[in-house]
Amino acid sequence: MRRSDRFPCAGASLLVVLCGVFPSSFGGRTLPGLSDDIPFRLKWPGPDFTLPTAGIPYKEENYIIMTTADQETYKCMLPLMANGNEEEDREYKGPSPGELLDPLFKLSSCSYRIESYWTYEVCHGKYIRQYHEEKEAGQKLNIQEYYLGKTVKKSPSEAGENQEDKERTEGHKDIHTKNIEGQMTPYYPVEMTNGTPCSLKQNQARSSTVMYICHPEAKHEILSVAEITTCEYEVVILTPLLCNHPKYKFRPSPINDIFCQSMPGSPLRPQSLEKLEHQQEEIKSPLKAKEEEQQLLKEKFSTIHKPVTVGSQQQVTVGTTHISRLTDEQLIKEFLSGSYCFHGGVGWWKYEFCYGKYVHQYHEDKDTGKTTVVVGTWKAEEHLDWAKKNLAKAYMSTADGVQTVKTVSHFYGGGDLCEVNEQPRQVVVKLKCKQSESPHAVTVYMLEPQTCQYILGVESPVICKILDTADENGLLSIPN
């Protein structure tokens, strides 16, 4: 093996240097480039070491000789790099992403995202609309709206030709990715143009890119809407339809190991690195003991009153979470007593629902604190009056013709005064059975079909167990 180039490295900065970007060649040897998007891990196996033959590949010539400030030398073997896309490289003969999304486009379905002022409507494969509704004193409804993009209709022949071209090139082009919560996530783009003219861009038409992202439990929710440049938008949609395509499945990036062998006369690991880690352990020890003590207290005194975070932006599972491991009986009792509350929503506003108590809309800010709007409060008399004029429960027929309760609806009125129509806010809460492999999955969403009149949807497998207890007014009780 030929002599390699050497470069000095201070012990404490060793990790930074190795995880940086190396020159492409050392002493005539071409080395693989390192990327900040792919995680690496340093390992110190000692002088007697055999490169792994399974997993991420290595080549004998892909190495550098590193010399620390203490004149310790190490031969560091660099991986050929894995980015988590190995399965994608296999031949795929299934439907294209466009074909997988085709049922969504043919259903004429729309998704909604409600923010503090604007509501966004994405009718898949057709258009994107941004609007705000207001009612004047005379009950005349004023709508302020902008189309952020529309799909250009094509003749069947043009559409067929374009689809054929797309399928021919799709297997060879790079998959688009977007950084979502620190993870590079693949998406399928759908361009929409010919939106409402933009006065800030010489009346050019607004346009949008709809980014469809795989999520197995999603219901085509709108994850985000962003104006990336003036009158040009990005809309991120979560859908389960793309998950059948290997190139669009989300996978965490694998960790690529860099093996640094000590050369003759050098310790197994650099002395300065050992010293640094020892100092860090001394700092961590008191904190770790305190964390362990807090965790024990939390496990000992934890109750089922902890709110459930639904649609947290700390995950990419918008509108879906997993409830803590409780028995169904406990959960049902606490839910019906109103002491177990659901929290849901993404974006500026979040929502809190406590059964038989209230529905709140709130925003938390680290500087200004928590802003809460009462959307509706529970009063049995008001609900009973509402139930006389509206459908409090809906039925569905099973395969053997038996009718079972599909949804129940409850009225919560007397919310905070609406600035637009000077009427109290109100909300209809729809409780629905959710079939899921996880018995404790729950989905919460909110719609505003009319100004300050809301619909809150709550779906869970637990609700399946109590729907049939609903009386003629839709009121639930603990099942026998």
Swiss-Prot record:
It is found in: Endoplasmic reticulum lumen. Probable lectin that binds selectively to improperly folded lumenal proteins. May function in endoplasmic reticulum quality control and endoplasmic reticulum-associated degradation (ERAD) of both non-glycosylated proteins and glycoproteins. Keywords: Disulfide bond, Endoplasmic reticulum, Repeat, Signal. Residues 163-172 have a biased composition (Basic and acidic residues). The keyword RNA-binding does not apply. It holds the Pfam family PRKCSH. Its main location: endoplasmic reticulum. One of its GO terms (cellular component) is endoplasmic reticulum lumen. Residues 152-172 are annotated as: Disordered. This is Endoplasmic reticulum lectin 1. Disruption phenotype: Embryos display head and axial defects during organogenesis. InterPro entries: Man6P_isomerase_rcpt-bd_dom_sf (IPR009011), MRH_dom (IPR044865), OS-9-like (IPR045149), OS9-like_dom (IPR012913). GO terms for biological process: endoplasmic reticulum unfolded protein response; ERAD pathway; retrograde protein transport, ER to cytosol.
